[in-house]
Amino acid sequence: VEGVRWEKKLGNFDIRDSMWDSLTNLGIGPAMGITAENLAERYQISRKEQDELALLSQQRACRAVDEGKFKEETVPIEVKSRKKTVLVERDEYPRKDASLEALSKLSASFKEDGTVTAGNASGMNDASSGVILASEEKARELGLPILARIISTATVGVEPDIMGIGPVEAVNKALKKAGLRLEDMERVEINEAFAAQYLACEKALNLNREITNVNGSGISLGHPVGATGTRIITSMIYELLRERKRYGLAAICAGGGMGTAMVLEALQKEEQEERSHV
């Protein structure tokens, strides 16, 4: 609510939706959905391709939830009301009933002849996330397990009207700094802000979908602004540890045209113990 810090004697109060800034490219460009439409046109991504990707995301997320893959990285929350207390232990967003038929019936959300719909875009939901980021020396001093180490990071900027392609150059830059190739990555997380946005990045980077977003992403798990970056990094670390893999790559786009990427090395239990006693 604007103008309430100081006394306002006459006139109306305007209530502003702060989320809208995040959905309109920080006021300097088109709505986020239009940027996805722009990428769909530029990279010739069809509605069918977007819906198929959305369905795959839902299927992967539902399978991961059923297999308990997120339990290690999530904290149950008690929600109290007057009548009862509910323990929330799993995400409510993944849709087991998702189907291509249902997805194909949805109307375009951002322009009349568009291809971006509520079904092939990320969900707006609430979440919080956190990690402990420390030097190896400090982690050893505190006796903390070292799950992974950051090898490199990179942040770049692209034109706001195609903001979703930001991860591409960020990935290339982060890999170069790390002295590694995309082929060296054993798990990849590229947030699905929109199916069109992810597919544009997939085409530009020639991503291997078999190792990318293997447990779902923004379309199926939701995209809580401000928490997604930590979420995809944490999920990737636990997936690398489960599968006894080493290198991972995570990247995300951001309103205004930023793209950020990080290359990580997961440390298996024996490596964690070795480092904690160095």
Predicted regions and their residues:
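Active-site-proximal alpha-helical scaffold in enzymes
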Residues: 1-2, 40-69, 131-137, 202, ...
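Active-site pocket-lining segment
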Residues: 34-37, 73, 81, 151-220
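N-terminal extracellular/periplasmic Venus flytrap/periplasmic-binding protein-like
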Residues: 49-141, 146, 204-211
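A glycine- and small-aliphatic-rich helix-loop capping segment at beta-alpha/alpha-beta transitions
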Residues: 1-14, 137, 204-209, 264-277
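Flexible glycine-/small-residue-enriched beta->alpha junction loops
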Residues: 1-38
